[in-house]
Amino acid sequence: MDTLSHKTLSSNKISADKKWFVVDAEGQNLGRFSSKIAKVLRGKYKTNFTPHADCGDNVVIINASKIVMTGNKLEKREIFSHTGYPGGQKRITPKEMLVKDGTSVVRHAIKGMLPKNKLGAAILKNCYIFSLEDHDKEAQKPTNLNLNDLI
């Protein structure tokens, strides 16, 4: 590469250098954890970050069912959804979500921190969440990621 060139290089889906990371969610605060994962998925910490392209990394999250929420948010917070029919508003607490599916609370938090468009949906597909410690992504050889090293 020409180091004296004054060109701005823009990354795209093909030229993006995607890595695989594994992150342990046990004992982590949900909001701080999710915002750091969203930055890694989006690729915002990379020098060749491009807002309109999927240039982020793939993340494997283990122990998602052991995530922590401060205070009594686990019982008091309500997450709303709507079926699309009149009177079809549904409410569920994070505690009920964890009982139903151990990964849904983390997935919901990360999804809320990504763009609300087709790119956000594509980026979320790079996140693999498992409620326990075992996962099926050993073939990709993911490296451990310490979230405290990220800003």
Predicted regions: what they are:
Residues G27, L132-D134:
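Residues that form or immediately flank small-molecule/cofactor binding pockets and catalytic motifs
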Residues L119, H135:
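Basic, amphipathic alpha-helical segments enriched in Lys/Arg and hydrophobic/aromatic residues
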Residues V106-R107, K111, L124:
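Hydrophobic, well-ordered secondary-structure segments
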Residues R42, I129-F130, K137:
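Aromatic-residue detector
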Residues M1-H108, K118, K141-I151:
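Ribosome large-subunit tunnel/peptidyl-transferase-proximal elements
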Residues G120-F130:
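C-terminal structural segments of small proteins and small subunits
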